Design a protein with these regions (language model features):
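Extracytoplasmic ligand-binding site segments that recognize negatively charged/polar headgroups
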Residues: 4-11, 30-34, 46-185
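Short, polar/charged alpha-helical segment
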Residues: 2-26, 100, 200
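A bilobed periplasmic-binding-protein/Venus flytrap-type ligand-binding module shared by bacterial periplasmic
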Residues: 101-106, 146-149, 218-230, 250-253
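Periplasmic-binding protein-like
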Residues: 125-133, 159-164, 170-171, 202-226, 241-264
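A ligand-binding cleft/hinge motif common to bilobed small-molecule-binding domains
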Residues: 57-61, 182, 187-205, 254
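Conserved C-terminal helix/tail region of periplasmic/extracytoplasmic solute-binding proteins
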Residues: 280-309
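Short beta-strand->loop
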Residues: 68-77, 90-92, 119, 204-216, ...
């Protein structure tokens, strides 16, 4: 079984699947935006079987394009309705939350005050000192854009025009803000927040900020590609993962995230590392339907600040 995943850390989980089923697994690391572009380019003959991780907007778009295979299993009833497709085309294995990451030394050197809210990031003191990932390739940062547009309504694009004035670089990977703030290239990163970020903060004298006006969040998807060569194995993996809490706990440990508790509240042995009230109110149905329109407008805004390699 061939898998496209958002990282190469999932080996132990897939090894457990191989141990249980005898199905060997080959993993290729790729962001959700890249997967969607590749899937469309392949014209209905996917080179992989299973899509594991990435922002749910890309999964919604893939479903609309007829590129996914539905998977139905009894344990899906234990997952929150908003975290699974009603027709079984995708399921969420957790959520990614987003906040700010500050390089304390650089902030002090530049005389910057710590931002506390999304609006604070538009202050001119941060000009050239903010980094975020390109929302066209990072599902997490697309969620930031969509969530803030929902929250700010008619003023949403004015906000991003102002924010763009302070952003120096739009990275190609979701980890770029963490890496570039940790190395001291930039003072402020708009970044996912998980245990790996907490560890980086401790090791590199960084501060994590949970925005006072709410944290954007995005469900992370799992799906099977339509017309996949090993479609039955991929469908069984989805059932295998969600039907056994031990597998979900192993996944949470690998990812160093507690978001599966939001997806499946009945799971034991996992506690959320943040209060749910910090999460922004989001209409997830808009994540997929608005994706093309939003990215078409955001791309020229980024200009030559977007990473190309």
């Amino acid at each position: 079984m061939k898998v496209v995943a958002t990282g190469d850390v999932y080996g132990p989980l897939f090894e457990e699947f191989t141990k249980d089923t005898g199905v060997t697994v080959e993993v290729l690391s790729m962001s959700s935006g890249e997967v969607l572009s590749k899937l469309r380019a392949e014209g209905g003959t996917p080179s992989a079987d299973l899509w594991f991780g990435g922002g749910i907007d890309a999964f919604m778009s893939a479903k609309d394009d007829g590129l996914l295979e539905p998977v139905m299993f009894d344990a899906a009833a234990d997952l929150g309705d908003e975290y699974k497709d009603a027709d079984g085309y995708w399921y969420s294995k957790g959520i990614t939350i987003v906040g700010f990451l500050l390089n304390n030394s650089l902030m002090e050197e530049l005389g910057l005050t710590a931002p506390e809210s999304w609006d604070d990031l538009t202050d001119s003191q941060y000009e050239g000192e903010i980094v975020m990932s390109n929302p066209a390739v990072s599902g997490t940062n697309y969620a930031v854009v969509n969530a803030l547009l929902q929250a700010k309504g008619d003023q949403g694009w004015d906000y991003f025009d102002a924010l763009n004035n302070n952003i120096a670089y739009y990275g190609k990977r979701g980890s770029d803000p963490k890496n570039k703030v940790s190395s001291g290239e930039f003072a402020v990163g708009i970044s996912y927040i998980d245990a790996s970020i907490e560890q980086a903060a401790e090791e590199n004298d960084l501060t994590i900020v949970y925005p006072s006006d709410g944290m954007p969040w995005v469900p992370e998807g799992v799906a099977v590609f339509k017309n996949a060569e090993n479609v039955d194995a991929a469908k069984y993996f989805v059932e295998w993962l969600f039907s056994n809490d031990d597998h979900l706990r192993q996944l949470a440990e690998i990812e160093q995230k507690s978001g599966i508790k939001v997806i499946k509240p009945s799971i034991e042995g996992i506690e959320l590392s943040y209060h749910p009230s910090l999460l922004m109110t989001e209409d997830l149905s808009l994540f997929g339907s608005q994706r093309t329109e939003i990215l078409d407008r955001f791309e020229p805004l980024m200009g030559d600040k977007a990473a190309t390699e």
